[in-house]
Curated annotation (Swiss-Prot):
This is Arginine--tRNA ligase. The lineage of its organism: Bacteria, Pseudomonadati, Pseudomonadota, Alphaproteobacteria, Rickettsiales. One of its GO terms (cellular component) is cytoplasm. The keyword Oxidoreductase does not apply. It catalyses: tRNA(Arg) + L-arginine + ATP = L-arginyl-tRNA(Arg) + AMP + diphosphate.
Length: 576
């Protein structure tokens, strides 16, 4: 039984009985209070109803108490503060959670959500001009784990990578590859400032030389550019796909910006928005602090993004008359919406924080307020070694690419550590501490808990085969799990689905990592307590029944840790 869902449904039923109102009760929350003295679960239903009915929250709370106290799983109810209803749940109800995890895991993880939503998450979208820089890893992991969470709770999710293959950086890439091609033909070259000096493009020049000889030099410039561009972009995308695959990340769609130009999607989108009265010709005022004489005050085609909360209207053309990057964003959003997407999520780096309002404006306009949009910013990662900052520069011989760091610490450590802080907060990644086998290393701490549960079962099979066989046959008395430490762990296990639901609701994958660290901590504490107090050991040779029950507890811990690591994309370890 999912106790959070069960209590929510019973509150809705009580609301229907008391106030003939189910819809408003759907907005009520069921949370775990921060302080134990406020009970096990708490709801704000009384304050929601009171605001609607214009009556006292405590009066409403008392009416709910009269009905809900009769529920068989409720031990007591207290009214606190302005009208919070705090519930204490009977111990046997928590103990049933162990049985549900072991015997009905799929049903236990069921979450009551609107599963009709079609969600598109765009993340990474690095320019295809070279190996993926480690700076992209946080957004890559955040986006990928968020997609996994949303899929886990039942949404249909598309993971998308927007390929920026139509801008000036691609022109610079082509120019560099052509120089490497000439070099492969025997010319002495110099890579000018502003191009890409990395050695990773040398093999591309060699491949072109082997395939074309000097034929590319004989072609007209436009034909040569097209051939080299298609070749270089595809090779760089292959490189990026491999970097992502090595992190356990696979996108469903790689969408080409160039395709928007090729099929005149930008023109069509501008025509649509013009018909909606959202495109006009005007002069943008200079930004604050900018002198008028230094500002380009030409007449431009502008999108009325201020209609939707943006700080200024946005140009859709550059000074030379070509489409702006913003114009591509307009057409790209329309393409997604035309595919039937009902919720767009953009995951951007810290350097794109200024794009939030303009992207929201685009989707609100094209989606006609029917399509949801969220723009999530991932702050910078500061790499350190024992607390000392590491300069992420290839020229200095330090880590620069995803491949470098992946080779040094492995994908599982990268994925977990990128979730040890909320995405909009800077993160310190200590390249030394993440490899330590200590409590200070969260990924080790969680994996060690998983390994310990396996060790408990293995040892029980050897030392107490009767207890182990009874556990395997589901012959255990869960009421024996009654100590304060055991109940605390069981309550945390029972809140796993709530953690998943909250992570999905607020787009906060770090909650999964935090939950796993908390669960591992409580488990290790009980294990260590058992070293000094034999009654708390998981295997007690003089008490077969309690041992059988604790094998069930250890297995439930193992299953939930494995489930959490699976959501994060980390392989649970069986031994260390």
């Amino acid at each position: 039984m999912n106790i959070f869902n069960k209590l929510k449904q019973d509150i809705i039923a009580a609301s229907r009985q008391l106030y003939n109102n189910q819809e408003i009760a759907n907005n009520a929350t069921i949370e775990t209070p921060k302080d134990n003295f406020n009970g096990d679960l708490s709801s704000n239903i009384a304050m929601i109803i009171a605001a609607k009915e214009n009556i006292s929250p405590r009066e409403v709370a008392l009416k709910f108490k009269e009905i809900l106290i009769t529920l068989p799983y409720i031990a007591s109810i207290e009214i606190a503060g302005p009208g919070f209803i705090n519930f204490t749940i009977k111990a046997e109800t928590w103990q049933i959670a162990i049985k549900d995890i072991l015997q009905h895991e799929e049903k236990f993880c069921e979450i009551d959500i609107d599963k009709s939503r079609n969600i598109n998450i765009e993340y990474v979208s690095a320019n295809p001009t070279g190996p993926m820089h480690i700076g992209h890893a946080r957004g890559a992991v955040y986006g990928d784990v968020l997609a996994r969470i949303l899929q886990k709770v039942g949404y249909f999710v598309t993971k998308e990578y927007y390929v920026n293959d139509a801008g000036s950086q691609i022109n610079d890439l082509v120019s560099t590859v052509l120089l490497r091609y000439r070099e492969a033909l025997g010319e002495t070259i110099t890579i000018p400032d502003g191009l890409y000096p990395g050695e990773y493009l040398i093999p591309l020049g060699q491949i072109l030389a082997e395939e074309y000889g000097n034929k590319l030099l004989m072609m007209d410039e436009e034909e040569r550019f097209k051939i080299v561009k298609n070749f270089a972009v595809e090779k760089m995308l292959d490189l990026n796909r491999k970097d992502l695959a090595d992190l356990g990340i696979k996108h469903d769609i790689f969408f080409s910006e160039q395709s928007l130009h090729d099929k005149c999607a930008i023109e069509e989108t501008v025509k649509l928005l013009t018909g909606m009265g959202l495109i006009y010709e005007g002069i943008l005022p200079p930004p604050k602090g900018k002198v008028h004489d230094e500002w380009d005050n030409r007449v431009q085609k502008l999108f009325k993004s201020t209609n939707y909360g943006d700080s200024q209207d946005r140009p859709i053309e550059k000074a030379d008359g070509s489409w702006s990057y913003f114009a591509s964003d307009l057409a790209y959003a329309k393409d997604k919406i035309d595919r039937g997407v009902s919720h767009l999520i953009y995951v951007l780096g810290a350097d794109h924080s200024g794009y939030v309002k303009r992207i929201e404006a685009i989707v609100k306009a094209l989606g006609k307020e029917q399509v949801k949009v969220d723009v999530k910013i991932c702050q910078l990662v500061n790499f350190v070694e024992n607390g000392v900052p590491v300069k992420m520069s290839k020229r200095l011989g330090s880590f620069a690419s995803v491949q470098d760091v992946n080779h040094e610490v492995g994908k599982d450590i990268i994925r977990f550590m990128m979730l040890t802080r909320q995405n909009d907060k800077p993160l310190d990644f200590d390249l030394v501490k993440v490899k330590e086998q200590s409590r200070e290393n969260p990924i080790f701490y969680v994996q060690y808990a998983h390994v310990r549960t396996i060790s408990i079962l293995s040892k029980a099979r050897e030392l107490m085969p009767e207890s182990y066989n009874n556990f395997e046959a589901c012959k255990y008395d869960l009421s024996l799990l009654s100590s304060e430490e055991e109940i605390a762990i069981i309550k945390l296990l029972a809140s796993w689905t709530k953690t998943l639901e909250t992570s999905a609701k607020y787009f906060e994958p770090h909650r999964i990592a935090f939950y796993l660290i908390n669960l591992a901590s409580k488990f290790h504490s009980m294990w260590n307590f058992g070293k000094e107090h034999s009654d708390y050991r998981f295997i007690i040779e003089s008490n077969k029944e309690l041992t059988t029950a604790r094998l069930a507890l250890a297995t439930a811990i193992q299953k939930v840790i494995a489930s959490g690591l699976e959501v994060i994309g980390v392989e649970p370890m069986d031994r260390m």
